[in-house]
UniProtKB/Swiss-Prot annotation:
GO terms for cellular component: plasma membrane. This is Olfactory receptor 56A5. Disulfide bonds join 100-182. The chain crosses the membrane at residues 34-54, 68-88, 101-121, 147-167, 204-224, 247-267, 277-297. PROSITE patterns: G_PROTEIN_RECEP_F1_2 (PS50262). InterPro entries: GPCR_Rhodpsn, GPCR_Rhodpsn_7TM, Olfact_rcpt, OR51/52/56-like.
Amino acid sequence: MTLPSNNSTSPVFEFFLICFPSFQSWQHWLSLPLSLLFLLAMGANATLLITIYLEASLHQPLYYLLSLLSLLDIVLCLTVIPKVLAIFWFDLRSISFPACFLQVFIMNSFLTMESCTFMIMAYDRYVAICKPLQYSSIITDQFVARAAIFVVARNGLLTMPIPILSSRLRYCAGHIIKNCICTNVSVSKLSCDDITLNQSYQFVIGWTLLGSDLILIVLSYFFILKTVLRIKGEGDMAKALGTCGSHFILILFFTTVLLVLVITNLARKRIPPDVPILLNILHHLIPPALNPIVYGVRTKEIKQGIQNLLRRL
């Protein structure tokens, strides 16, 4: 495909995505592991959703939260990965103006929704381990419903201005985005307007939301750890530490990659441009692939539910 020049001053109706500028010839090979991860993420999350829906014994607050996390993972994967694979396989690099900013909105809002869901799940584990006698009265179906509304409303409303601000910019610096996906940073760099407000709002809101969630997650697991260390039975202690430890490591991976992405964007002149592009893609693949395994499949009730589901097929 012949790409337009980035010196064009004509109105922009579509953008062109350039994946891995330095490794164009490797894209077909890279598509193979990405496709496998995509299929794993979609299959694992879909299986978890179907299992929880069909198994009456799993109609409990914890599993409703797992369903919410799986739904967010599926939407994030479908927003990003099919377009990336279409570029790799069919050289379909163009993306319309509205589709690009819809992608910006979904990525910003759903990533912060996922962070907020992690925080609520950490609170759920805190109540279960630190206040077990009060669990059934605190973590109710009504609590989960209110939490889900909070997750969607807080993050959807606060991240909505990011694509709105970007879509109102004048794009006279070209059409070519040096990325596989429409991120706010890569798109707004093409504008000939001042993007200070745009970039500042995303930075402040993004890290306020993610930072507050992370602080509450760390506090929850700190109190969980204190309680677990008081458990007398070594087997029970090891089981609790193993479960909570794997949860916390997954959350740490989620936030660490976001932090690395921010650092690479700030120091982009010193870092190869393909590094943040790859991190962006992996961040939309690895957590969705691991979440149902770490949070769901390792749970005895989920395993039993999947076995029951397979018997019905």
